[in-house]
């Protein structure tokens, strides 16, 4: 079972009495299983600063400076820990991964502009930050975007998901005049759906921060505006950035059965009861979120994937919170089966599966089928504008991946696309696209 809290206090006392230590740096937990590792490096499923009470016991027993770092994501939590005399110094490792300028912003009175860690644990998988694409890419991407020393340009961005918001933010920091069109009544795109499960709603703070920044930077954002080609050309733009995202990829399913997409479920547009079969083609968080969302409502859920494990591309430290909920709610998990077809039969849906190893087929009779296979680019507007643009919508990929400026030629506007309109990926990739492209415009 390891050392108890009291065991550790006694060890700390002995080390202090022996005079061999000057301070204590306290962490809590074990890392021998995935749930314990998740508890040791907690993400958004855990409360902020979950071990402060245990740290307080050390403070009461040992007269040494105490340092502590575990999910202290923001200065308000850090300030509480210090003001209550629980710790002498707070560690904010992931906080500084999200925003290396926490201290500088605080010192200059810009605490409200600090980009706080959301606890997605993206950094545990990829050593990058889900919301700060410059982290670990400092050799070619800036944390601080410099102002363009050349002329101010008119930049039009279409779509206020993470890619569009970041494009607008970075272009505004460059000193350009930015107009942002969004068809919906609020910003966020797919992130708003990702945060529908209550323990993951901290993802919404990514959008909150971006939206607050573009307001500070005086971006002209127009909601409830389905921008068409004429609307964009009327702005007389120098640069047009398409960030219109994608639409659910479900049309490939063979058969005549109704196929429901994840968006309609998470948005509340579709209400499902009975036995719901979810087929996941991506291994990312979306299917997991839908299974969590429905099972919490008491729906009987089967979650199937053709991968060798559920959530093969999800964040490793998010899998334990998902799996805990699935086991508690008797969600049936199925792996190694691809979806062949879905047919309507006697008010049921017959789902035909094939084992990818044996090639044996089997049928499941369910009430509803949800297919999560990512998105297809919503790129109609891009192709409407392509022939009128100076660069014909073409991007130099070598320059793009290095964060260098794209070629400037011709008298017409330059046209680019970022985020899922280029291909179905995740929040980090959408933000990375925009920073790479826009930091040198």
Please annotate each region the language model reported.
Residues 18-21, 57-65, 210-222, 329-332, ...:
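A structural motif corresponding to the C-terminal end of an alpha-helix
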Residues 177-217, 285-339, 422:
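Rossmann-like dinucleotide-binding cores of NAD(P)H-dependent redox enzymes
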Residues 149-183, 222-236, 243-316, 357-368, ...:
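Rossmann-like dinucleotide/flavin-binding elements
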């Amino acid at each position: 079972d390891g050392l108890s809290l009291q065991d550790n206090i006694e060890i700390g006392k002995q080390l202090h009495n022996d005079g061999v230590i000057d301070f204590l740096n306290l962490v809590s937990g074990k890392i021998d299983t995935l749930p314990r590792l998740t508890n040791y490096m907690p993400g958004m499923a855990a409360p902020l600063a979950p071990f402060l009470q245990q740290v307080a016991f050390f403070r009461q027993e040992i007269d040494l400076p105490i340092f502590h770092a575990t999910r202290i994501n923001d200065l308000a939590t850090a300030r509480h820990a210090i003001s209550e005399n629980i710790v002498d110094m707070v560690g904010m490792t992931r906080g500084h991964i999200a925003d290396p300028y926490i201290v500088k912003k605080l010192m200059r009175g810009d605490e409200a502009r600090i980009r706080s860690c959301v606890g997605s644990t993206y950094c545990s998988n990829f050593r990058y930050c889900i919301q700060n694409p410059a982290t670990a890419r400092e050799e070619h991407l800036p944390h601080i975007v410099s102002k363009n020393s050349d002329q101010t340009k008119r930049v039009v961005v279409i779509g206020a998901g993470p890619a569009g918001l970041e494009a607008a933010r970075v272009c505004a920091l460059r000193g350009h005049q930015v107009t942002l069109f969004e068809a919906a009544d609020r910003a966020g795109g797919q992130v708003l759906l990702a945060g529908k499960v209550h323990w993951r709603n901290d993802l919404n703070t990514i959008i909150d921060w971006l939206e607050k920044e573009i307001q500070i930077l005086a971006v002209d954002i127009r909601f409830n505006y389905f921008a068409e080609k004429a609307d964009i050309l009327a702005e007389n733009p120098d640069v047009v950035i398409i960030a219109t995202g994608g639409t659910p990829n479900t049309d490939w399913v063979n058969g005549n059965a109704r196929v429901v997409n994840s968006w309609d479920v998470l948005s509340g547009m579709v209400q499902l009861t009975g036995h719901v079969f979810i087929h996941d083609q991506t291994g990312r968080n979306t299917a997991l979120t839908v299974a969590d969302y429905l099972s919490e409502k008491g729906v009987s859920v089967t979650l199937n994937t053709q991968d060798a494990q559920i959530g093969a591309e999800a964040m490793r430290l998010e899998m334990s919170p998902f799996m805990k909920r699935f086991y508690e709610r008797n969600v049936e998990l199925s792996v190694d089966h691809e979806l062949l077809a879905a047919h309507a039969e006697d008010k049921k849906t017959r789902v035909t599966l094939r084992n990818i190893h044996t090639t044996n087929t089997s049928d499941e009779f369910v009430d509803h089928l949800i297919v999560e296979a990512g998105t297809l680019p919503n790129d109609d507007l891009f192709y409407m504008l392509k022939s009128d643009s100076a660069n014909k919508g073409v991007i130099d990929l070598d320059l793009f991946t290095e964060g260098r400026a794209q070629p400037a030629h011709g008298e017409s506007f330059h046209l680019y696309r970022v985020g899922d309109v280029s291909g179905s990926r995740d929040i980090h990739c959408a933000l990375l696209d925009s920073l790479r492209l826009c930091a040198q415009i």
